[in-house]
A protein has these predicted regions:
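Conserved beta-strand positions in repeat-built beta-propeller and related beta-rich domains
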Residues: 1-4, 10-15, 46-57, 98-103, ...
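Blade-loop segments of beta-propeller domains
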Residues: 27-90
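Repeated scaffold domains used in trafficking and secretory/extracellular systems
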Residues: 31-42, 83-91, 132-139, 180-186, ...
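Beta-propeller blade signature
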Residues: 59-68, 160-168, 243-254
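Surface-exposed loop and turn segments in beta-propeller and other repeat-based domains
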Residues: 72-82, 114-135, 174-178, 261-278
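Loop/turn-rich, solvent-exposed surfaces of beta-rich toroidal or solenoidal domains
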Residues: 179-188, 192-248
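Blade-level signature of beta-propeller repeat domains, shared across WD40, Kelch, NHL, RCC1
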Residues: 243-285
């Protein structure tokens, strides 16, 4: 009798579907173009773009999937009419926060999925503006009385920054990083940060390179108690990004590579299915 396959450990959002995966296999569980991904128990919440991210058609939405084993049920639509270019979403302090990247806003939704507040941690911009005030915020992490936002800064041709704000989104400090165009922000147990140095295929902290992953673009970072998962893919022109495949590289907490999985789509976000994940603002115990 053959043994049952190992259960999936991670959920992976991508431009071409939502996947479940572990170190050995993956499965497509939902069609769609997904960017942000978070979870509560067996419920997964995603930002889904209904059009190309740079198109101002406002077909973005927040959807929920209920997980049952290796599958999910039909999507529940919770919020509609969002900009297609939104990125990460996460629960923190009783609300769900959405990073409205192209408009440089943080949207806060209450438990009834009503818009409770629109926050401006940096000066807002109009869709499509790329001037000296466009930072391309792409990641959100709430901890204690602070919120950490990742400023990509790619078009500014200057290093990315971790922007720390209070819960009223007033700036406390900026932490400069090694390179521009970074993604994801995780705070480790000892207080240091871990970030995807996307253009150099590595993970970095506030001081330098922690580990080289590959020669691709790193994006999507999950940090569990014993295992790290990092997404990577080629960097393509906008019209073809949904066609580009990708990888998930698994490492132990000493940053030694333990496995590598080839996916048919480029990861945009990775979360542990058990919720014990430092990439979440409210990780499970």
């Amino acid at each position: 009798m053959s043994s049952a396959p190992e259960p999936f450990t991670h959920a992976i959002a991508s431009r071409d579907g939502l996947f479940f995966a572990n170190r050995y296999r993956f499965a497509l569980v939902a069609e769609g173009q997904f960017f942000g991904l978070t979870l509560r128990g067996d419920e997964l919440y995603c930002f889904e773009a209904g059009d190309q991210p740079w198109v101002p058609s406002r077909l973005g939405r927040i959807v929920r999937f209920r997980r049952s084993g290796d599958c999910v049920g039909e999507r529940d639509i919770l919020v509609e009419g969002l900009d297609n270019g939104c990125h990460q979403i996460d629960f923190f302090a009783g609300s769900c926060f959405v990073v409205d990247t192209y408009n440089q806003l943080i949207l806060e939704y209450d438990s009834d999925w009503q818009l409770a507040a629109t926050h401006q941690p940096v000066p807002p911009v109009r869709l499509g503006e790329t001037g000296h005030d466009y930072f391309h915020i792409n990641s959100f992490l709430g901890l204690g009385d602070s919120i950490f936002l990742l400023l990509h800064n790619g078009r500014l041709e200057r290093p990315s920054e971790i922007l720390e704000v209070d819960c009223a989104f007033r700036e406390r400090r900026r932490i400069p990083l090694l390179e521009r165009a970074c993604h994801d922000v995780v705070r480790l147990e000892e207080g240091g940060f871990l970030v995807c140095n996307s253009l150099h295929g590595s993970l970095i902290d506030a001081h330098g390179t922690v580990v080289e992953i590959d020669a691709l673009m790193t994006r999507g970072l999950s940090v569990g108690k014993d295992e790290i998962a990092v997404g990577s893919s080629l960097f393509g022109a906008r019209p073809v990004r949904s066609l580009i495949p990708g990888f998930v590289t698994f490492l132990d907490r000493a940053y030694r590579k333990t496995a590598r999985l080839h996916l048919p789509a480029a990861p945009t976000q990775i979360r542990r299915l058990d919720g014990v994940d430092l990439s979440l603002s409210c990780p499970a115990e």
